[in-house]
Every structure is written in C-alpha cells, then in structure tokens.
C-alpha cells in the first residue's frame, strides 16, 4: 500500500514537471538595438531605452496616432509622462515613461486590465520604429 502511494506521488511529480516545462516559453519576438532590459510581468511590459525623454515621448505619441488609438489622458510630472489611450474596441492602453537617474528612459506598457504580452510587444516595436525614424531624420523633431 505504501509503495503504491509512493509510485502515485512520483508519477504526479513527474507529470507536474512535464506540465511546467511545456508552459515555459521563450520570447520569440525580435528585440531592438535601442531596447534593453525587456521584461513582462503581471500584465505590464517594461523596457529601457537609450534615448532622451523628449524623443521617446514623441515616438510614443506618433506610434499611438499611427495605430489610431484615441488619447484619453495625458499627464506630465517632472521626469514622468503618463498616457492613457483607448482603441476602437474600448480597451485601455496605458503607457508610462520615466527618466532614469543613471541615464536612459524606462517605459511601461499595459494593454487592457489584465495585460496582453503580444500586443504590448507590437506597440513597443512600433514605438521603436518611430524612435529610429526621429533619430535618423532630424527635421522631424
């Protein structure tokens, strides 16, 4: 009886390990040269940029306008910018930009109430494209 229980516990542990290994997934999305320290946790996508706050702020506004997001709220406070957008389905998109003390800028993206990793990555890549465009064409500033 005791041996049967040990076998069942061992089988359950092996099944749990296999299930956990199948749930782990690597990030297949290509990262950009401008973006460092990308992380996704608890519905918020976070990335650091080697750029200025002014350029990243402008890139966020351009990318969201290109995605036809409607601006609902805009807040500036010292080294922090906060935007709340809404898409055509009524889903909120929150973007926070914070200037870091050691240089660079940190951006946080949250799409919807629970977060959406794939959409956040797509928005991050669109913002990075806009930032690259702003850096290469100085007349666009």
Positions of predicted regions on the chain:
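C-terminal motif of bacterial Sec signal peptides marking the signal peptidase cleavage site
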Residues: 18-22
